[in-house]
């Protein structure tokens, strides 16, 4: 296993940035084809070190790339000028192609995230479907409808108006904006474009459970194929470690198959 910590100057973020990359010792088991690549997006208050990327890379023989998104919700923040979505979906993809020969096409490039990173994975995949062919999102912070119409001085117990305004822009119009994954995926469907294969999960004891159920229902009502799974679990690394392995197996391993809508029975 090769572990690399790579530093380069990001035009999207206007500073030097660092990402972690893991390459399996065995390399690519599919002959001369380029190695498949998985992007891992961390959650709120986290960083690239939150992931056990080396375990996934070694077991399934793909490259793992873990960037740092700070607390920016992996969005192009209109108020801050920090373009985290552009950084991942354009700049980092192109850097990996030029420098390492990775992430060459959507069929072999996937993105996965948990919590804030789950939101970011869905949003990034829908914003750049030509780059990402599959997306896995765990315990996703799908909070658009909660923060819509928040007023200055208000807080939801996690963060305040100023923070959300910095990440999402105008909260009066956020539900119909480019920051909303629902808007992006619906546009792909309406325009007849390829939608990335979608894998989602959430724990039945997770405080974001209803948010994830609502997005699952939206995808069903919009007739967008996806897999949605629930099982006992909280908003923590135990659940994310279990499902990162499960989804990697489904996306890369012996359980690979055509995605169709599927959900397990709800509990409680």
Regions found by a protein language model. Give the residues of each.
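Non-catalytic cap/lid and distal C-terminal segments of serine-dependent acyl enzymes
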Residues: 1-268
């Amino acid at each position: 296993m090769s572990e690399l910590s790579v530093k380069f100057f990001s035009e999207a973020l206007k500073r030097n940035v660092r990402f972690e990359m893991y390459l399996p010792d065995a390399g690519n088991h599919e002959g001369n084809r380029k190695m498949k690549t998985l992007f891992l997006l961390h959650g709120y208050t986290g960083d690239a070190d939150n992931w056990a990327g080396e375990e996934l890379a070694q077991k399934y023989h793909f490259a793992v790339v873990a960037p740092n998104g700070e607390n920016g919700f992996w969005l192009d923040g209109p108020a801050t000028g920090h373009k985290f979505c552009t950084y991942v979906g354009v700049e980092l993809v192109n850097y990996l192609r030029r420098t390492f020969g990775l992430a060459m096409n959507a069929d072999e490039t996937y993105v996965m995230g948990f919590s804030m990173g789950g939101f970011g994975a869905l949003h990034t995949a829908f914003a750049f479907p030509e780059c990402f062919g599959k997306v896995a999102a765990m315990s996703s912070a799908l909070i658009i409808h909660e923060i819509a119409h928040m007023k200055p001085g208000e807080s939801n117990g996690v963060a305040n108006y100023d923070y959300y305004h910095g990440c999402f822009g105008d909260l009066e119009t956020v539900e119909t904006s480019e920051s909303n994954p629902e808007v992006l995926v619906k546009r792909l469907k309406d325009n007849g474009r390829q939608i990335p294969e979608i894998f989602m999960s959430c724990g039945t004891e997770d405080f974001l459970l209803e948010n994830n159920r609502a997005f699952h229902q939206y995808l069903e009502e919009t007739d967008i194929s996806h897999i949605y799974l629930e099982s006992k679990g909280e908003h923590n690394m135990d659940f994310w470690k279990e499902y990162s392995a499960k989804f990697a197996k489904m996306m890369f391993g012996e359980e690979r198959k055509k995605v169709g809508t599927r959900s397990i029975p709800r509990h409680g």
